[in-house]
């Protein structure tokens, strides 16, 4: 069984624009179009059995939209989607409970895109609360091709 554990998708209405921005920032050409349908096509071509989508909440206002989109994709056609939260969101425990209620297995954090250092106390509190609820926590580490060094 092959599982691609680090994928991203975007809502169809913003996927093309978002992919172009990421391509320009990274100086590379994307091999997929950023949509769920594009991911499924890529999975089939590559022989991938499951893909895990890791959305990134880059600002607190994206919380509802990203998690509702993640929940809609989760569990369909060999797709597992995590949720997302920003360390500057208010009511972190309630928001994490909502992610769990949506049936999402965990959250993805991205210190660079969220513009908060990983050793910031906000992350520690957020991670502790997530673990207490039984949510998995994925933290992006290393260099991101879409960000300047």
Please report, for each region that a protein language model flagged, where it lies by residue.
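An N-terminally biased module of ancient metal coordination in phosphate/nucleic-acid-related enzymes
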Residues: 1-56, 61
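Active-site gating/metal-coordination segments in enzymes
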Residues: 49-50, 60-147
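Glutamate identity and glutamate-enriched acidic tracts
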Residues: 13-16, 23, 115, 121, ...
């Amino acid at each position: 069984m092959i599982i691609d554990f680090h994928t991203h998708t975007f809502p169809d209405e913003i996927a093309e624009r978002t992919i172009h921005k990421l391509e320009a920032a990274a100086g590379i050409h994307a091999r997929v179009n950023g949509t769920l349908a594009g991911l499924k096509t890529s999975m089939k071509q590559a022989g991938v059995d499951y893909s895990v989508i890791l959305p990134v909440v880059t600002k607190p206002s994206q919380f509802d939209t990203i998690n509702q989109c993640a929940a809609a994709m989760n569990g369909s056609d060999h797709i597992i989607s995590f949720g997302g939260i920003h360390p500057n969101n208010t009511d972190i425990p309630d928001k994490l409970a909502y992610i769990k209620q949506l049936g999402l297995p965990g959250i993805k954090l991205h210190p660079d895109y969220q513009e908060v250092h990983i050793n910031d106390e906000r992350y520690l509190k957020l991670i502790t609360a997530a673990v207490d609820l039984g949510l998995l926590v994925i933290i992006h580490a290393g260099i991101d091709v879409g960000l300047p060094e």
